[in-house]
Regions:
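Residue-level signal for nonpolar/aromatic packing positions in well-ordered secondary structure
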Residues: 7, 36, 58, 93, ...
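Short alpha-helical
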Residues: 5, 27, 50-53, 87-88, ...
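Mid-domain Rossmann-like dinucleotide-binding core that forms the NAD(H)/NADP(H) cofactor-binding site
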Residues: 1-70
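C-terminal hydrophobic helical "lid"/dimerization subdomain
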Residues: 91, 135-189
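Short strand-turn motif at the edge of the Rossmann-like AdoMet-binding core
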Residues: 106-110, 130-133, 157
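Aromatic/hydrophobic pocket-lining residues that form π-stacking "cages" and hydrophobic walls in ligand
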Residues: 28, 32, 54, 92-93, ...
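Glycine-rich cofactor phosphate-binding loops and adjacent beta1-alpha1 units
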Residues: 14-17, 44, 52-126, 187-189
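Short beta-strand/turn micro-motifs composed of small residues
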Residues: 24, 47, 84, 107, ...
Length: 189
């Protein structure tokens, strides 16, 4: 639920952008891609270098293009959303957006953003963050999700394996979202 809500809030911060880059293709991005496609937008998915499985997943959800996060898309983007907690992606996203484009930092935390040349911001590009969502965001998303319809891909882990789940998440080995379930629930299933 959180991934969909914060993803939706991040997408709304891009305004009416038609070509949207998504950096970090995990829980939020796989939901945002479905919503954006429903809205008639094009998604350009950026993953860790060499993550062909993640890129294939993005394309299977309707992304117009998928590639490594350190490469430029085939055309300039109107906006980009960064879900990966990697500050070094901000300058890369700024290079990928056109004049007047917006880069939205949509995660709850991020490493430091490195120094960048002013020319990346010049021509009215902007960077913003998402800290919270509003009640209205939630109402809009929950009304929209069944119309899309949003289909989530999840990988479940027993609660006793929470550390392993975090390791998989950090290393980019989760397709969609990781979900922790009580161990006794798995024994009954």
């Amino acid at each position: 639920m959180c991934a969909g809500l914060i993803g939706y809030r991040s997408l709304t911060k891009t305004g009416q952008a038609r070509r949207v880059g998504v950096y970090g293709f995990g829980a939020a991005a796989h939901i945002v891609t479905q919503v954006a496609r429903f809205q008639g937008r094009e998604i350009y998915a950026f993953t860790r270098r060499g993550d062909r499985e993640g890129q294939g997943f993005a394309l299977s959800l309707g992304a117009a293009w998928a590639g490594d996060s350190d490469t430029l898309p085939p055309e300039k983007l109107d906006a980009a959303v960064i879900f990966a907690p990697a500050g070094e992606l901000v300058p890369l996203a700024l290079k990928a957006v056109a004049k007047g484009g917006t880069v939205v930092c949509g995660g709850i935390h991020m490493s430091d953003i490195p120094a960048l040349p002013y020319e990346l911001l010049w021509e009215e590009r902007s960077v913003c963050s998402v800290a919270n969502l509003t009640r209205r965001d939630g109402e809009e998303f929950f009304a929209l999700a069944p119309r899309v319809p949003v289909r989530t891909t999840v990988q479940t882990f027993p609660l006793s394996e929470a550390n392993e789940a975090l390791d998989c998440l950090r290393s980019g080995h989760i397709k969609g979202a990781a979900v922790l379930v009580p161990d006794e629930h798995l024994r009954r299933a």
